[in-house]
Amino acid sequence: MAETLQKRHEQIMRKFDRAHSPQEAVREKCLEATRFARVPGGQWEGATAAGSELGKHFEKYPKFEINKISTELNRIISEYRHNRITVKFRPGDKTASEALANKLNGLFRADYEETDGGEACDNAFDDGSTGGFGCFRLTTNLVNALDPMDERQRICLEPIYDPARSVWFDPDAKKYDKSDAEWAFCMYSLSAEKYKAEYNKDPATLMSGIERSWDYDWYDVDVVYIAKYYEVKKESVDVVSFQNPLTSETVTYDSDQLELVEDELADIGFIEAARRTIKRRRVYVSVVDGEGFLEKAQRIPGEHIPLIPVYGKRWFIDDIERVEGHIAKAMDAQRLYNLQVSMLADSATQDTGSIPIVGKSQIKTLEKYWANRNKNRPAFLPLNEIVDKQGNIIAPPTPVGYTQPQPLNQAMAALLQQTGADIQEVTGSSQAMQPMPSNIAKETVNHLMHRSDMSSFIYLDNMAKSLKRAGEVWLSMAREVYGSDRQVRIVNADGTDDIALMSVVINDNQTGQVVAMNDLSSGRYDVTVDVGPSYTARRDATVSVLTNLLAGMLPQDPMRQVLQGIILDNMEGEGLDEFKEYNRKQLLTQGVVKPRNTEEEQMVAQMIQQAQQPNAELVAAQGVLMQGQAEVQKAKNEELAIQVKAFQAQTEARVAEAKMVQILASADSAKRAEIREALKMLHQFQKEQGDASRADAELILKATDTQHKQNRDAAKNHSI
């Protein structure tokens, strides 16, 4: 076993040499550029692109630094911090949830804010834009490390300092985000004392009795180098899909997850639909030094190496990855500018008079007075007389001659101006940042600002690629870290926060335990980035635009009140909280804005329910109206009854007439006249009865119509 670990360690050391050797010169240039821009005196270090070391050639000159490259570099960094790049998740297929995507957005913002996300990204962007290479990492920490029963974790974003010396990727990885890397190193150094205290090992043993097959020296006098070694392994995993025949819902689990949920899935109607063996990416991390393993390999959440590179400019030339920051091409011009300023300053500080020419005997023992004349500025300078061997004065102490003062080099001044222009041209120094006259057209100003933005676009675009990769790595880790049913804090885009659940749960019937069915396990979520002004800047711009729009609206415009509410909702100020809360309730009531949390959803539902319930006066008015309608219907029914009775009476009369006709036909002639007279009287009586019935029906209908009109007028008065 020991021999196997030793061979494994040797393989890891050789991998490090493979990553370090071709990149060593490139990373040294990154460090040199960073020191050149940030460390005092760094602009006199190193050599030019052609290999000349100016510091050695001009040791006796004063060395001034007029840092003309930092202004543009600071502008690029400030532009990034003003226009933050945000990560967004969105559903990638039909099984993904829009609501869960919004929760992921809020949870990522919460992890970014509560950990070192801001510092990690800012530090990586600074390193990338200055030296050419930056990096940050994602890791997991316990939510409550003091509670041994609390196993909850959260994803953290951590900065990596001095990444040009510490982060090394698989040289076979060619993609910008290193998503194709199979392994990587993240180094850090410890003092000998801390190394001994933390790992209970004597650093001296690292150099004794080791037959090394690698080149890098992991121990240097008082410093011990150790590294986290990340490696991606592709392991065979059985993936099982279950489907509900009734709902056609499908869920997928790895084979090692089935023990927890298999019986519950069967109880709720899921049956196994398909099974497949796939290669699953899993990441392992171990800690190594120059002798062996300090910590054995352990699996970490996610499927990707959690190291996120950030580049300034990047190329592959001669199969070597080459990077540089914004100032790399301006370093020679800056060195020349500093040299010219130093030479002019040296010339200006020298004695402008002629230098006396004297013999050695005239200056003997008096050198210090003459050497320090520009520094001490004495009232007079001593000089020895010329004497013979007997000590007699031959000549007075008079200089033999004088040197001619060197005139100011006009070409030097012109060259100094040209060098400054060269620095501005190479760095793309923004003229838009200089004061402008007030009479310049708005289109011209926008054109200058756009041209200025182009010089920093490549750095912001590369940072967007890096943050997109960070979102992919975070999502891969979140599927495991936030897989249990627990409340998590999410942060909305406007900075407000809420509590949300990332999963649903079912009960294990055998153990009684609650088993989480993670919503994140189903569906694909795409990661995008949004490059633009911060939420505060966009909100202020919205207020400005809407205020101008409001000024052009008529007072009676129905949209004016809505516009005023939106402006107030986007405003910030002291003492506006209660007023804004009232205003938002009004906007929610009108349906102008959507609820953004559970409390507002409940409030909107309550308002809708109240709107559906009529008030007492309306109910009373509706009751009167219904009563009137009932009376009208009653009158119609009575009219129909009268008509039916009249029809029945007429029918009976016709039957009686028919019977009379039959009797008349069978009677003799003497009685026929009497029968006819009786029929005539009967017909007259039926007619009078029918007329009386119709008159009674009309009176009833008129009375009913009058009562209905009175009830309707009463209902209108109630509603008013």
Curated annotation (Swiss-Prot):
Predominant place of localization: virion
InterPro entries named among the record's database cross-references: P22_portal (IPR032427)
Example of a GO cellular component annotation carried by this entry: viral capsid
UniProt keyword annotations, A-Z: Capsid protein, Late protein, Viral capsid assembly, Viral genome ejection through host cell envelope, Viral genome packaging, Viral penetration into host cytoplasm, Viral release from host cell, Viral short tail ejection system, Virion, Virus entry into host cell
Residues spanning the membrane: none
Quaternary structure annotation from Swiss-Prot or TrEMBL: Homododecamer.
Assigned protein family: Belongs to the p22likevirus portal protein family.
Name of this protein: Portal protein
Protein source organism: Acyrthosiphon pisum secondary endosymbiont phage 1 (Bacteriophage APSE-1)
Top-level taxonomy: Viruses, Duplodnaviria, Heunggongvirae, Uroviricota, Caudoviricetes
Gene (UniProt): 19
